[in-house]
UniProtKB/Swiss-Prot annotation:
<feature type="binding site">
    <location>
        <begin position="211"/>
        <end position="214"/>
    </location>
    <ligand>
        <name>substrate</name>
    </ligand>
</feature>
<dbReference type="InterPro" id="IPR029063">
    <property type="entry name" value="SAM-dependent_MTases_sf"/>
</dbReference>
<comment type="function">
    <text>Catalyzes the formation of N(7)-methylguanine at position 46 (m7G46) in tRNA.</text>
</comment>
<keyword id="KW-0949">S-adenosyl-L-methionine</keyword>
<keyword id="KW-0489">Methyltransferase</keyword>
<dbReference type="InterPro" id="IPR055361">
    <property type="entry name" value="tRNA_methyltr_TrmB_bact"/>
</dbReference>
<dbReference type="Pfam" id="PF02390">
    <property type="entry name" value="Methyltransf_4"/>
</dbReference>
<dbReference type="InterPro" id="IPR003358">
    <property type="entry name" value="tRNA_(Gua-N-7)_MeTrfase_Trmb"/>
</dbReference>
<feature type="binding site">
    <location>
        <position position="173"/>
    </location>
    <ligand>
        <name>substrate</name>
    </ligand>
</feature>
<feature type="binding site">
    <location>
        <position position="141"/>
    </location>
    <ligand>
        <name>substrate</name>
    </ligand>
</feature>
<feature type="binding site">
    <location>
        <position position="88"/>
    </location>
    <ligand>
        <name>S-adenosyl-L-methionine</name>
    </ligand>
</feature>
<comment type="similarity">
    <text>Belongs to the class I-like SAM-binding methyltransferase superfamily. TrmB family.</text>
</comment>
<protein>
    <recommendedName>
        <fullName>tRNA (guanine-N(7)-)-methyltransferase</fullName>
        <ecNumber>2.1.1.33</ecNumber>
    </recommendedName>
</protein>
<dbReference type="GO" id="GO:0008176">
    <property type="term" value="F:tRNA (guanine(46)-N7)-methyltransferase activity"/>
</dbReference>
<dbReference type="GO" id="GO:0043527">
    <property type="term" value="C:tRNA methyltransferase complex"/>
</dbReference>
<feature type="binding site">
    <location>
        <position position="115"/>
    </location>
    <ligand>
        <name>S-adenosyl-L-methionine</name>
    </ligand>
</feature>
<comment type="pathway">
    <text>tRNA modification; N(7)-methylguanine-tRNA biosynthesis.</text>
</comment>
Amino acid sequence: MAERHPERSTEAFFGRRRGKRLRSQQTAAVEKLLPRLKLDLSSPAPAALDSLFGKPLREIRLEIGFGGGEHLLNEIRRHPDVGFIGVEPFVNGMAKLVAALEGEAPPNLRLYDDDATKLLDWLPDSAISRIDLFYPDPWPKKRHWKRRFVNKANLDRFARVLCVDGQFRFASDIEGYVNWTLLACRAHPDFRWVAKSAEDWRHPYEGWPGTRYEAKAMREGRHPAYLTFVRV
């Protein structure tokens, strides 16, 4: 079994915490909804993770670095019987998502606005059915590669919290980071790449809504890859 608290990097996996000044509507949404949806890690995680949502749920999924929230919003509406935990340390991304909720706190959504490794270390074993990591910061300079989120320590974290046959999904338009992730996951004993042909990773996931970042990448001639790994 992977250890509960693997090594944590001394440098954050994310860059700035804040970008442009928030609009008044976004500020109001953050002040109203984030306290209601934010997870409190000061107490141990419950063994039955759906108790965080106050109702029985079919499964719990995790999205790390949800950006503007396009995919996460689409998923919580498509699957009301599934619990979703969204992690986004960038203030502007969190503000976009909560503003899009239009004052409603979906019962199947919980949020966390800090380092995802803290949340991963807090979660109980085998509690998550799927982890999504889409378009993470590629940290293109070689001296910054140690800050890429996909690494041995974080794959150990994923392996601990994912149930057997759970999925880790990764999408990126940066070929170097795609290859990096393939090599890391194929070298890890707890993950298996499920692609049987190139068509399996060239096309978006079922129900994929697209994102603004993805659209920009494609306009600039970069072609995303959509990888899926299974916890064995």
